[in-house]
């Protein structure tokens, strides 16, 4: 027992041995361990009470509430009893005992009030009470032990023990979540937001997710909800407000914005990171103290010292585990916030960006949401390391100076030199990464176009050429990336250069400079304490270099975001026309000058009209220039007034600016000079290229409008969609596909038109809505919408329609002609048709046309009949880890892998063996063998050189040889899978999902897999080597390692059942983001015109949230694993400490004990590296697995029997035979062609006509093998197409599909993609089509095709140039002139007739008068050939037939059979009789 007098000092330790060695005094425990935490907690509790009183109730009183209050009331009662006991004179006490007891009692009363408010007004248990009571329990255990050894203190000790039990009970109750008591809206919060501090510190809240992933396949529904603070809506509204006040012209503006906005989350990681530094730098003191303890085992206080050393080891290593997990978790929470902000801000700014004319706007945004965001995530992971490394270096320098004196200067100077070089590498790496990202951007731009225009690319046989161009861009990207990878190799070399040579320099200086060591030999305590500090010093240097490079990479990506946002803001601010999405209405003309000007314009353009007042004016322009920039003015000096409830027709030749004018009316074009004023906020807009979302037909038509079934039916009828829907298996629930690829061109146009009609907006802006429609369908739509009793007239809507179709002339109130140099406006009653009709063509159908508009239609393009399918999820446990590893090893090369592994093992040996060499050195010094100093120093130095050689060799081999090889092979595997995929397969798959494989998956494979692989392999081998060294120090530690390894095995087995699934979900959730961004960019003008911007932003936020869930929760389970493995290291450290203290005989020499203790420090650091690398590698390999599955599972369009090789000059003649052909787009779908039989003689010119959706395009699709046959056969020059590879067929034909596909590159590349023609031949065909005068000033054949020809009609002409310049015997044109004005169309027809001499020509058209000069005309209806004869015979047939009749194939044959040409089944078509 101990007297109270011995414990009434401030201590901290008692001087009486009877109280126990190294025992705290009771006064110290009361004044420091009790009073300090209590005082802080009371102050914070009062502030927290004030805060909670302002909160709304979130939970009800339940049994947990009453249990907690009961525990606190009992605790207060016990404290009151204890206070009374302390006041008794006979009770032994210190001078502070009564005061502490009184304050404790009073504080418990405060805690009762706080507990009540925390339960009722907070969704989670009280962090403050939990932290205080846990801390209090730890200190009270020490106080309880002290009270029980005080003489005469049994009563107060018993009472205090009861209080300790009650504190423990309350801490357990307070740590329980109050799920059952929470109100319903708070139950949707993330478990992290509803759980206790202890639960969050040890990541117990992720255990349910880990168990779910262990037992079953995860899907998005199994993931936790995000808490409110990291939800995208919250992040956007917070950051958007700050962005408005940010000057984006300043460097680093976006980065600083994120730091300011989320500073508290950033700072939340500072305290645990500082704690980690404290715990980490406690290790050298523990090593020194342990070695001292080992040398003085016989001391009187050795037992107590050993016990405290065990406690200290436990505290330090458990503290390292918790603090490291805490700061990294806060880092990733900050990254999640930054990620959510950037994705939502970019989309919001994209929604407000300027439209582009011809320049593809997609690639920059796609790179920003994929590659750049990944670089930012990776860079910010080391943000706390950047500043903490300086603290670590300073502390390490101070500690080294205590051990090595002035010898510290050269070693630390060398380390700082590495830091300086590291900063330079970081700057260089940032600029080189920018070049790499720009190369990725170019590749993704072309890849996106190929995927979205897949059918056109296939039909034109440009898929291999496009793929070769993509491969070329990939090779350039890899070449550019090598410069960046050299920086990475240099960075890693600098990191390990300090690690290897700093100890060598320090020990060499110390031993060779007598003035420094002063005859003090390098003993084990000094050597291994110094080695421990060197490990921490070099870790700080390596962390700084690594974090500096990563941060610079992140900064460069932040700057790309800033530049993109700045460009959009600059464009927005420079516009003169008001924008639709502004909150206020655009300004009207208010002054009398404006009114007078409007009167003048109206007087100049109308006869005897009363000028309207401002309320009747919809659009006003005066001497306005319109274009896409100040250098690209398209419409000059436009003066126009569009009045409400009128129809305005805009006409003009191709490239005259019709589409640009409509864009200007939406505020989407560049305005120069006086403004173009719009007196409306929203308009129904139909783009020239119909934009459709990848949704159902019904969803596209409804858009954001409320559901009105009657009006919906009226809209379908007016737009002639009812017959089409009747032929689709899913009707209006048919998904339209990427870019509407599951619909025909005419159907896409009519769905877009129906969307405009259904919206019932006052303003209709319609661009070329009759292209791709047959005459009868056009006539029906024009009458139903524009006629005297049409929907537009009845509703009093204002309509501006851009078209050259003569159907609108008699219905328009005014006509704007853009084809006469300067715009000319003509009112309806002015019969001045000459300036107009030059650009207008008649599309009325022949009288008595047999092509019935009311008949059921067939879908012409792709898989329109396919039922709505759920996206097929990739299996997440299909491939074993071994198979994926082996697949990746094969891509990088088995020999390359073996070389790299050997270099890694050499590196580990050269870095681990020096500690053993130092042990032998100090033991030799201890024996007095000081004459071999040169040997030890030289070997030490050469080991460092060997390590450096192995490091540089291994890093260069990995980054400059292995990674580029795998990058090429895996990209080629993806691209090859796409190239050989059938068209229906690609149209079924979402374009965003496919593109995500070329962006996100390859980004991970190029960056994460090699870096994580190197870190994992090196750390793993190092951990094994260091574990062996630790085990050598004691056989007991070896015995303890066995169950530890078994435990680690089961931990990783449990963890790896979930983490790859989460990574797969993470990758899958990014695909909709990319797809949504693509969809938005392509339909930007339409979305803004309809006023759907807010809806699309909300959808983007939902997609961001769905993407954030797996991303954030993956980082959480990674922290769980890191914490568990760090606790395993803590267990090893505690076991080692116990073994050393318990081994009375000193089982290991001081040298090997020093190695064990030093290796334990390095083992913890390397295990941390192994954890980070391994978790990164096993999740990054998910991307490799996705590539492997996609390349293996993607269907191939060529069948085994399609393997014959035709003659090199096939087809020689161009004879085409269809023999009883029936075709459909898949099993269970409607036949799109039924029993079609005909023969086309060599050199014939055949026109194919029929209403929209009749099967014309399906018929020519069978020729290009993009549509499979159910039965029958097709022969060209007597060779069945089913026996040939499909691309061989396409290359032999000359195809011109409906949708023009322009290759990225020069005009020369587009016209002559296979490099067969001379420049003169290319120029000739361009001149023939009227393109050369446009292209010559822009660079001629070297001009960029996309930017030089912005108008869709010009792109179509360029594709015609490609078609006409190609050699070949069979030419197939599918409605190719549908978007051309009559003048351009006439030029094209003339060129076709000239250049098709001697060729077989098939031309799909909507009306027979477009086919003058053709030998025969084929009429297709409902998938059947109903007529096939000379133009005169077909014209007579159509004129004599009733439009309401429903002819069959046989009846048509009977009517048209004459001589050599028959429509009925031909029989054996290869025989002479069949050809007679």
Curated annotation (Swiss-Prot):
Pfam families: ABC_membrane (PF00664), ABC_tran (PF00005), TMD0_ABC (PF24357). Glycans are attached at residues 244, 464, 694, 776, 805, 842, 1235. One of its GO terms (molecular function) is ABC-type transporter activity. It is a multi-pass membrane protein. It is found in: Cell membrane. Residues 274-553, 898-1179 form the ABC transmembrane type-1 domain. The chain crosses the membrane at residues 26-46, 64-84, 97-117, 122-142, 146-166, 266-286, 302-322, 380-400, 409-429, 487-507, 533-553, 898-918, 936-956, 1017-1037, 1121-1141, 1151-1171. Induction: Expression is positively regulated by the cluster-specific transcription factor frbF. ATP binds at residues 652-659, 1250-1257. Its main location: membrane. InterPro entries: AAA+_ATPase (IPR003593), ABC1_TM_dom (IPR011527), ABC1_TM_sf (IPR036640), ABC_transporter-like_ATP-bd (IPR003439), ABC_transporter-like_CS (IPR017871), ABC_transporter_C-like (IPR050173), ABCC_6TM_D1 (IPR044746), ABCC_6TM_D2 (IPR044726). FR901469 inhibits the activity of 1,3-beta-glucan synthase from Candida albicans and Aspergillus fumigatus. With minimal inhibitory concentrations (MICs) against Candida albicans and Aspergillus fumigatus of 0.63 ug/ml and 0.16 ug/ml, repectively, FR901469 displays greater inhibitory activity than other 1,3-beta-glucan synthase inhibitors such as, WF11899A, echinocandin B, aculeacin A, and papulacandin B. It comes from the Eukaryota. PANTHER family: ABC TRANSPORTER ATNG (PTHR24223:SF399), ATP-BINDING CASSETTE SUB-FAMILY C (PTHR24223). ABC-type transporter; part of the gene cluster that mediates the biosynthesis of the antifungal antibiotic FR901469, an inhibitor of beta-1,3-glucansynthase, exerting antifungal activity against the pathogenes Candida albicans and Aspergillus fumigatus. FR901469 is a cyclic depsipeptide containing 12 amino acid residues and a fatty acid chain. Probably involved in the secretion of FR901469. This is ABC-type transporter frbG. It comes from Dothideomycetidae sp. (strain 11243). The lineage of its organism: Eukaryota, Fungi, Dikarya, Ascomycota, Pezizomycotina. The gene is frbG.
């Amino acid at each position: 027992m101990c007297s109270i007098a011995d414990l009434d000092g401030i201590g901290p330790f008692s001087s009486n041995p009877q109280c126990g060695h190294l025992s705290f005094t009771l006064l110290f425990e009361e004044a420091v361990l009790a009073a300090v935490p209590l005082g802080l907690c009371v102050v914070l509790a009062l502030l927290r009470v004030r805060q909670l009183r302002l909160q709304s109730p979130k939970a009800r009183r339940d049994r947990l509430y009453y249990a907690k209050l009961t525990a606190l009331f009992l605790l207060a009662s016990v404290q009151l009893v204890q206070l009374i006991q302390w006041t008794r004179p006979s009770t032994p006490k210190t001078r502070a005992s009564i005061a502490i007891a009184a304050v404790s009692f009073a504080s418990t009363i405060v805690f009762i009030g706080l507990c009540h408010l925390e339960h009722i007004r907070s969704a989670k248990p009280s962090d403050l009470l939990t932290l205080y009571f846990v801390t209090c329990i730890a200190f009270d255990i020490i106080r309880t032990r002290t009270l029980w050894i005080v003489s005469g203190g049994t009563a107060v000790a018993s009472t205090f023990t009861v209080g300790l039990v009650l504190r423990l009970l309350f801490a357990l109750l307070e740590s329980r979540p109050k799920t059952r008591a929470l109100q319903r809206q708070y139950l949707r919060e993330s478990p992290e937001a509803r759980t206790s501090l202890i639960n969050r510190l040890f990541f117990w809240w992720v255990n349910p997710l880990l168990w779910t992933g262990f037992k079953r396949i995860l899907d998005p529904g199994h993931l936790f909800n995000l808490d409110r603070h990291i939800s995208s809506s919250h992040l956007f509204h917070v950051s958007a407000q700050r962005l408005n006040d940010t000057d984006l012209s300043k460097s680093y503006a976006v980065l600083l914005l994120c730091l300011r906005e989320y500073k508290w989350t950033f700072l939340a990681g500072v305290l645990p990171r500082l704690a980690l530094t404290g715990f980490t730098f406690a290790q050298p003191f523990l090593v020194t103290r342990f070695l001292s303890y080992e040398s003085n085992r016989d001391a009187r206080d050795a037992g107590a010292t050993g016990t405290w050393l065990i406690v200290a080891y436990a505290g330090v290593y458990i503290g390292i585990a918790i603090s490291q997990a805490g700061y990294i978790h806060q880092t990733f929470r900050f990254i999640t916030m930054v990620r959510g902000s950037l994705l939502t801000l970019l989309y919001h700014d994209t929604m407000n960006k300027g439209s582009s004319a011809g320049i593809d706007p997609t690639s920059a945004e796609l790179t920003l949401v994929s590659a750049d965001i990944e670089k930012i995530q990776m860079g910010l992971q080391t943000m706390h390391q950047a500043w903490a490394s300086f603290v670590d270096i300073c502390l390490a320098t101070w500690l080294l100076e205590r051990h090595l004196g002035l010898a510290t200067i050269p070693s630390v100077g060398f380390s700082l030199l590495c830091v300086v070089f590291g900063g330079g590498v970081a700057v260089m790496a940032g600029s080189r990464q920018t070049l790499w990202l720009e190369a990725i951007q170019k590749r993704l731009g072309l890849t996106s176009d190929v995927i979205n225009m897949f059918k056109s690319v296939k039909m034109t046989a440009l898929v291999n050429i496009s793929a070769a161009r993509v491969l070329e861009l990939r090779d350039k990207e890899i070449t550019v990336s090598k410069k960046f990878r050299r920086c990475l190799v240099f960075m890693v070399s600098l990191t390990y250069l300090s690690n290897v040579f700093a100890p060598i320099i320090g020990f060499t200086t110390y031993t060779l400079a007598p003035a420094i060591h002063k005859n003090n030999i390098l003993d084990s305590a000094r050597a291994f304490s110094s080695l421990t500090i060197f490990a921490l010093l070099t870790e700080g240097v390596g962390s700084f270099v690594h974090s500096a490079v990563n941060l610079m990479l992140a900064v460069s990506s932040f700057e790309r975001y800033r530049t993109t946002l700045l460009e959009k803001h600059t464009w927005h601010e420079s516009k003169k026309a008001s924008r639709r999405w502004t909150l206020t209405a655009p300004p009207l003309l208010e002054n009398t000058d404006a009114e007078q000007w409007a009167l003048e314009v109206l007087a100049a353009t109308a006869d005897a009209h009363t000028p309207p007042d401002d309320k009747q004016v919809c659009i006003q322009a005066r001497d306005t220039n319109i274009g896409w920039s100040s250098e690209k003015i398209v419409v000059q000096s436009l003066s126009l007034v569009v009045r409400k409830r009128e129809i305005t027709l805009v006409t003009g030749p191709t490239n005259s600016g019709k589409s640009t004018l409509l864009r200007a009316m939406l505020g989407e074009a560049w305005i120069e000079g006086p403004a173009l004023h719009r007196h409306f906020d929203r308009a129904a807009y139909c783009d020239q290229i119909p934009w459709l979302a990848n949704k159902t037909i019904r969803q596209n038509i409804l858009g954001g409008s409320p559901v009105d079934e009657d009006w919906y039916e009226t809209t379908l009828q007016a737009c002639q969609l009812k017959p089409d829907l009747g032929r689709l298996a899913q009707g209006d629930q048919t998904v339209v596909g990427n870019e509407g690829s599951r619909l025909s061109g005419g159907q896409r146009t009519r769905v877009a038109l129906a969307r405009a009609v259904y919206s019932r907006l006052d303003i209709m802006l319609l661009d070329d809505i009759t292209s791709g429609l047959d005459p009868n369908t056009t006539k029906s739509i024009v009458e139903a919408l524009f006629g005297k009793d049409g929907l537009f007239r009845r509703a009093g809507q204002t309509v501006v329609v851009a078209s050259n179709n003569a159907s609108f002339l008699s219905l328009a109130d005014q006509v704007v002609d853009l084809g006469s140099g300067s715009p000319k406006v003509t009112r309806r009653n002015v019969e001045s048709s000459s300036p107009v009709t030059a650009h207008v063509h008649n599309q009325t159908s022949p009288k008595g046309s047999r092509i019935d508009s009311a008949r059921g239609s067939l879908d012409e393009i792709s898989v329109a009949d396919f039922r709505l399918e759920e996206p097929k999820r990739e299996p997440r446990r299909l491939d074993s880890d071994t198979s994926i590893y082996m697949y990746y090893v094969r891509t990088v090369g088995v020999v390359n892998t073996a070389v790299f592994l050997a270099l890694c093992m050499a590196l580990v040996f050269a870095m681990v063996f020096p500690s053993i060499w130092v042990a032998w050195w100090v033991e030799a010094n201890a024996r007095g063998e000081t004459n071999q100093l040169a040997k030890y120093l030289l070997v030490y130095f050469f080991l460092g050189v060997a390590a450096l050689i192995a490091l540089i060799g291994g890093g260069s081999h990995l980054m400059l040889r292995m990674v580029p090889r795998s990058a090429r092979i895996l990209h080629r595997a993806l691209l090859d899978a796409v190239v050989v995929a059938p068209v229906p397969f690609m149209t079924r798959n979402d374009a965003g999902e496919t593109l995500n494989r070329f962006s996100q998956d390859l980004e991970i494979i190029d960056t994460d897999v090699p870096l994580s692989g190197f870190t994992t392999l090196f750390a793993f081998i190092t951990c094994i080597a260091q574990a062996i060294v630790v085990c050598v120090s004691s056989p007991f530690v070896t015995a303890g390692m066995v169950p530890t390894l078994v435990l680690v095995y089961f931990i990783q087995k449990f963890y790896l059942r979930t983490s790859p699934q989460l990574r797969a979900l993470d990758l899958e959730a990014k695909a909709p983001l990319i797809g949504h961004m693509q969809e938005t960019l392509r339909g930007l003008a339409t979305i803004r015109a309809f006023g759907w911007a807010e809806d699309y932003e909300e959808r983007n936020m939902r997609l961001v949230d769905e993407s954030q869930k797996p991303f954030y929760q993956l980082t959480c389970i990674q922290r769980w694993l890191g914490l568990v493995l760090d606790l395993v290291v803590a267990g090893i450290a505690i076991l080692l400490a116990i073994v050393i203290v318990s081994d009375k005989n000193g089982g290991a020499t001081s040298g090997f004990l020093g190695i064990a203790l030093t290796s334990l420090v390095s083992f913890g650091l390397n295990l941390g590296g192994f954890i980070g690398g391994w978790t990164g590698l096993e999740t990054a390999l998910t991307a490799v697995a996705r590539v492997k599955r996609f390349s293996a599972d993607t269907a191939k369009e060529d069948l085994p029997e399609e393997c014959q090789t035709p003659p090199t000059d096939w087809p020689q003649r161009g004879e085409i035979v269809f023999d009883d052909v029936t075709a459909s787009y898949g099993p269970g779908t409607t036949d799109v062609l039924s029993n079609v039989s005909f023969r086309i003689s060599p050199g014939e010119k055949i026109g194919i006509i029929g209403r929209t959706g009749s099967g014309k395009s399906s018929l020519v699709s069978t020729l290009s093998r993009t549509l499979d046959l159910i039965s029958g056969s097709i022969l060209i020059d007597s060779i069945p197409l089913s026996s040939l590879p499909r691309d061989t067929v396409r290359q032999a034909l000359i195809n011109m599909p409906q949708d023009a596909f322009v290759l990225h590159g020069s005009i020369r590349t587009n016209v002559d993609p296979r490099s067969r023609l001379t420049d003169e031949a290319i120029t000739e065909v361009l001149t023939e089509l009227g393109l050369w005068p446009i292209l010559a000033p822009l660079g001629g054949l070297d001009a960029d095709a996309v930017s030089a020809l912005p108008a869709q009609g010009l792109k179509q002409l360029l594709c015609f140039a490609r078609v006409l310049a190609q050699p070949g015997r069979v030419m197939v044109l599918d409605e190719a002139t549908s978007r051309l004005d009559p003048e351009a169309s006439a030029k094209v027809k003339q060129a076709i007739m000239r250049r098709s001499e001697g060729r077989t020509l098939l031309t799909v058209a909507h009306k027979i008068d477009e086919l003058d000069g053709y030998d025969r005309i084929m009429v297709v209806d409902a998938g059947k050939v109903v007529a096939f004869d000379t133009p005169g015979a077909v014209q007579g047939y159509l004129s004599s037939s009733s439009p309401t009749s429903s002819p069959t194939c046989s009846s048509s044959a009977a009517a048209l059979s004459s001589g050599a040409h028959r429509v009925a089944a031909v029989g054996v078509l290869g025989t002479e009789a069949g050809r007679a």
